[in-house]
């Protein structure tokens, strides 16, 4: 079974994303900020990380940079899912190692 870590400070977004991913047979874990997400990745590296940009404690971008620097052999796919919708954010995310970039709100 594929695994996904949802990293978002919004409980509502995490709940909706969890519901969608579980219907697609993903095993889902959640984190409310980047620091918590790093801890969860150290315990069990997911296949996919669904990542918000703006969060307290540690942003999604900080998390992504630290995750990629650690150079784990089993690096997850990282999909930013954020309200940041300008080209500068998109370019920065992709250059830092994000695999995809999806803008909220989404249908």
Across the structure, where does each feature detected by a protein language model lie?
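Charged docking surfaces used in two-component/phosphorelay signaling
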Residues: 15-23
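Short hydrophobic/Thr-rich beta-strand motif most characteristic of the beta2 strand and flanking loop
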Residues: 25-32, 40
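Active-site beta3 strand of CheY-like receiver
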Residues: 44-50
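Receiver (REC) domain active-site loop signature in two-component systems and cognate sites
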Residues: 55
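Alpha4 helix (beta4-alpha4-beta5 surface) of REC/receiver domains from two-component response regulators
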Residues: 62, 85-100
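A Lys-centered signature of the CheY-like receiver
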Residues: 104
């Amino acid at each position: 079974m594929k695994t996904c870590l949802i990293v978002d400070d919004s409980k509502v977004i995490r709940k909706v994303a969890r519901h969608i991913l579980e219907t697609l047979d993903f095993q889902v874990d959640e984190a409310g900020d980047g620091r918590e997400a790093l801890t969860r990745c150290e315990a069990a590296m997911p296949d996919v990380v669904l990542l918000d940009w703006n969060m307290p404690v540690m942003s999604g971008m900080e998390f992504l940079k630290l995750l990629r620097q650690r150079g784990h052999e089993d690096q997850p796919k990282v999909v930013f899912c954020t309200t940041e919708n300008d080209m500068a954010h998109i370019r920065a995310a992709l250059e830092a190692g994000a695999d995809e970039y999806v803008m909220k709100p989404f249908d």
